[in-house]
Amino acid sequence: MIQVLLVIICLAVFPYQGSSIILESGNVNDYEVVYLQKVTAMNKGAVKQPEQKYEDTMQYEFKVNGEPVILHLEKNKDLFSEDYSETHYSPDGREITTNPPVEDHCYYHGRIQNDADSTASISACNGLKGHFQLRGETYFIEPLKIPDSEAHAVYKYENVEKEDEAPKTCGVTQTNWESDELIKKASQLNLTPEQQRYLNSPKYIKLVIVADYIMFLKYGRSLITIRTRIYEIVNLLNVIYRVLNIYIALVGLEIWNNGDKINVLPEAKVTLDLFGKWRETDLLNRRKHDNAQLLTGINFNGPTAGLGYLGSMCNPQYSAGIVQDHNKVNFLVALAMAHEMGHNLGMDHDGIQCTCGAKSCIMSGTLSCEASIRFSNCSQEEHRKYLINKMPQCILNKPLKTDIVSPAVCGNYLVELGEDCDCGSPRDCQNPCCNAATCKLTPGSQCADGECCDQCKFGRAGTVCRPANGECDVSDVCTGQSAECPTDQFQRNGHPCQNNNGYCYNGTCPILGKQCISLFGASATVAQDACFQFNRLGNEYGYCRKENGRKIPCAPQDVKCGRLYCFDNLPEHKNPCQIYYTPRDENKGMVDPGTKCGDGMACSSNGQCVDVNTAY
């Protein structure tokens, strides 16, 4: 997989202005004291229940730069999955997993009245803390520690004293943007009905965040402090990704309070590889999820603030990223995590031609002091191309309502325990099969949505709801008893395909020839067998796998499970042993797992040529 670095650059030096104040975010030189006035405005359906501590909607009025503003807040009901869990460890190493009640939480999204482009991400747990955008500028707000007072400080990030003003440069500040032409082609594609349905469907990323041991020490060994910081980060992630029709549900939080489960090292690439493997072999066996992010207190070598695999969402090992907790202002840490998750969703670094209407966009190769929460036009097209080409399936699945540990919330678009359907608020609902006020089916309806729901009735048994996508896939059909299409079924792994040139693997037929075409174009073919002997060298030109960052040479019988060697038949390309290799994406150009490497033999995920019956 391609790994993409994110680093920090903060070049401005800000003069001392007025008296300084110490806030959670650091020493702030220039700030405005505001006094919040809660505005009573009971919206339809926004009745506070007697046992509810935090209201579903709130409004506050205060002044910014002497002008009154009204901040509208709405509880982020998509912040947690119904089966959200937290894991930490006892002193003797025992795993302790709990399902804390998170329904009546204090995390909100919002907007400023009469500013159509405004956004807000606010924690209302103890006063208001977070950020809001007003007339294109980002402000931070947090309570002053004055007893029995509504006094808050409002300030800009530029007025926070920096612990280290030394400019930091980026190892990959420039991206060649080699896929720019592909982006143009993707936007001009005539999509199949299946691709169009996929693009239009809302996406749900079930996220697990892991905080390492240094984070535990950094925040005074306080599980509560770390939990609060991560909740605030995920609340902002939801604001950022909502524009892409993506909902992020935190399904798990794990804190390594008794020591790290992997070696968390200053070498970001090594740490990411170790974390991805741990996710695949350990975390996924304990907690079903789509994506994992490691939040670490370690300082990576150089200016690196994060690292993520490119185009890897739903992959067991590579749907992951690592992020350094590099700033007291959690807004900037959230931007770094949004950036790494953007790589997982197929977005590369922005080139000079990319724009988002701000000085810096989410997928800029550097994280600047003037960062915005917007994706550039390039990022949005790159993401769209990735969805069209790869169609990752796990993010189509809403978080399950089974194993629910908190009360259902009608109107959050998630069907939870006790609900038949959920089409949003009565104002937004456009589904005639669902009563938005009760989240129950309308009279006479059997279903409200699903691939096997046809005009509020279950589809006829045997109706194809998911056509076969190639010879290694099978068509899935409706049962007549449910609105949902059954679990996607594939031809069994190891079944011969492509005229016995390959074996089916997770619904695809990976063969060397197609992989060469994918890398070098239609004129490419597989190189001669002699070329694959370079995989015995154990360097960038040939190896079978990496262990702790070290390239392991292929054994003689495994050479066709290492780097892929191709021959491009175009006259201008004379190299008979051509590979795809660049330092920033070392894993691209390796032979895909499941590829046939001999009669009855296939490549394992560990780069070994093994019996096809044991390869999977």
UniProtKB/Swiss-Prot annotation:
Family: Belongs to the venom metalloproteinase (M12B) family. P-III subfamily. P-IIIc sub-subfamily.
Major localization listed first in the record, in broad terms: secreted
Co-factor(s): Zn(2+)
Residues that coordinate or bind Ca(2+) 2: 473, 476, 488
Residue numbers covered by the propeptide annotation in the UniProt entry: 21-193
Glycosylation sites: 377, 506
Activity regulation behaviour: The proteolytic activity requires Zn(2+) and Ca(2+) ions. The alpha-fibrinogenase activity is completely inhibited by EDTA, but not by PMSF.
Motif D/ECD-tripeptide per UniProt: ranges: 471-473
Subunit note: Homodimer; disulfide-linked.
Disulfide bond sites: 314-394, 354-378, 356-361, 410-439, 421-434, 423-429, 433-456, 447-453, 452-478, 465-485, 472-504, 497-509, 516-566, 531-577, 544-554, 561-603, 597-609
Free-text description of this protein's post-translational modifications in UniProt: N-glycosylated.
Residues in Disintegrin domain copies: 407-493
Residues reported in the UniProt entry to bind Ca(2+) 1: 409, 412, 416, 419, 422
Protein name per UniProt: Zinc metalloproteinase-disintegrin-like protein H3
Compartment(s) of residence: Secreted
Residues of the Peptidase M12B domain: 203-399
One Pfam match: Disintegrin
Keyword Ubl conjugation: no
Signal peptide: 1-20
Motif (Metal-binding): 339-350
Cellular compartments per GO CC: extracellular region; plasma membrane
EC number of this enzyme: 3.4.24.-
Sites of Pyrrolidone carboxylic acid (Glu) modification: 194
GO biological process, any: proteolysis
GO MF annotations, alphabetized: metal ion binding; metalloendopeptidase activity; toxin activity
Keywords linked to the UniProt accession: Calcium, Cell adhesion impairing toxin, Disulfide bond, Fibrinogenolytic toxin, Glycoprotein, Hemorrhagic toxin, Hemostasis impairing toxin, Hydrolase, Metal-binding, Metalloprotease, Protease, Pyrrolidone carboxylic acid, Secreted, Signal, Toxin, Zinc, Zymogen
